[in-house]
Amino acid sequence: MPGVANPGPSKSRRETADSSSRKKVHFSSIHDAVRAGDVKQLSDIVERGANLNEVDALHQFTPLHWAAHSGSLECLHWLLWSGADATQTTTRGWTAAHIAAIRGQDACLQALIINGANLATQDDRGCTPLHLAATHGHSFSLQIMLRSGVDPSVTDKREWKPVHYASFHGRLGCLQLLVKWGCGIEDVDYNGNLPVHLAAMEGHLHCLKFLLSRMNSATQALKAFNDNGENVLDLAQRFLKQNVVEFIQGAQYEGSHPDDHDDLAFPGHVAAFKGDLEVLKKLIGDGVINLNERDDNGSTPMHKAAGQGHIDCLQWLIEMGAESNITNKAGETPSDVAKRFAHLAAVKLLEGLQKYEIDDIESDKDHINFFTRHGVEGSTDAKDDLCLSESDKANARMRAHKKIVELRQLLEIAESNFKHLGGITEEDLKQKKEQLESKKTINELQGQLAYERLRREKLECQLDEYRVEVDQLKETLQKIQVTSVAAMEDDSCESSKEKRRVKKKVSPGGVFVRSYQRIRTSISSQV
């Protein structure tokens, strides 16, 4: 495939493109105009009769294929608006989505998905765009496709799934993303190879460690044989992968370094966090992770380096073309993270990349900063091959905004025409539905209110009856209390009289008896 290994234009080429003295080139073919990202000449060539789906003689690419290949996002938008066929394939069975996945053009891939591109289309080897993104280590492109609902466990003609491709090519970022989305790491291919077999035979130690840490039994995985009777150690020895051989023989997988488990998933982020520039360079240079790799929190290595104030790591990432406007799940850019941790040198370095001040942005399209770059521009997995100046990019944003205004006006006209013809719009239907629901709610509340009023009146009547009954009971109680008091007083008077009578009778008799006994006793003693 043309240009797959091309990492993008160099810094000097971009500086040349930004110079105001750049000469205007006139293109003779629609494919050249698309590769250069010149949407004006593309439009002119099509107006002169060029076919939107014209195939070039050398590579059998359509203009849409070339737009996805070079990252000509505006041209790709224009072609899709104009009706270009997104299902047309090359001689190898690649659609524009396949090429965007290979090149890591995630912005182009998003545009294709929005326009209905079929991500389940397989090429001549049975590979979908998902397989190709995993092969080339474009984890953000992979994530975009997974979020669109594509099957993460689709197989090619060799029964390889995306997880097999990521393991074989040592794409740790893609591998961990696929595992997170539920891809089976214990599935075998047509030769009985597990992903750990493929990682071992290619010497991808980071991927091997990660796979073993996520498998149900690492010991069983190392002992598992493929259809040729080879286990992980056999394959590593046959292909002379000494690092894997030493790892297995040293039994490091059995938990001798439990503190390193976080490093298995995001070693690049850990290196950036620690300021280990050499490890970071090696990981990115070897393709284990890409420059703008996201972790579970959406942070890139630049976020990690900015949070710790590692200026050397930040400078290297910037020189390599890392995107400084990516936001994590908290909505923070690397500059925001540096501010939060008060690393002023990092803040100054990162804010120097911005060509505008946030406070100066206005919603007025006539403002000078309205069409300047305000966020992530284009793809983040891989840089495009275009050499566009800042004015060209601003003009592209102006054209896109103009398209928005035109379509809004057309939509208003179309809605007005529809209403004039007796139709009803979705907005009107929604309003009527809301009105009906409001009316229904009001009626229900009014009925509830009437019921509560009747209930209140009934309760008030019962309350009046209870009050009358209480008054009657109070009167009866008072009468009973008065009668009982009078009776008690009469009883007390009678009892006191009876006591006095008994006292008078008993006292004299008792004295007489005692006197008689004393006299009798004295007579007896004398005798």
From Swiss-Prot:
Pfam families tied to this protein: Ank_2
InterPro entries associated with the record: Ank_Repeat/CDKN_Inhibitor, Ankyrin_rpt, Ankyrin_rpt-contain_sf
GO cellular component: nucleus
ANK repeats: 25-54, 59-88, 92-121, 125-154, 158-187, 191-220, 228-257, 263-293, 297-326, 330-360
Annotated spans, Disordered: 1-27
Keywords, ordered alphabetically: ANK repeat, Coiled coil, Repeat
Composition-biased stretches (Basic and acidic residues): 12-21
Keyword Repeat applies: yes
The organism's place on the tree of life at top rank: Eukaryota
GO terms for MF: NF-kappaB binding
Protein name: Ankyrin repeat domain-containing protein 42
GO biological process: positive regulation of cytokine production involved in inflammatory response
Keyword Transcription tagged: no
Residue ranges the record marks as coiled coil: 395-484
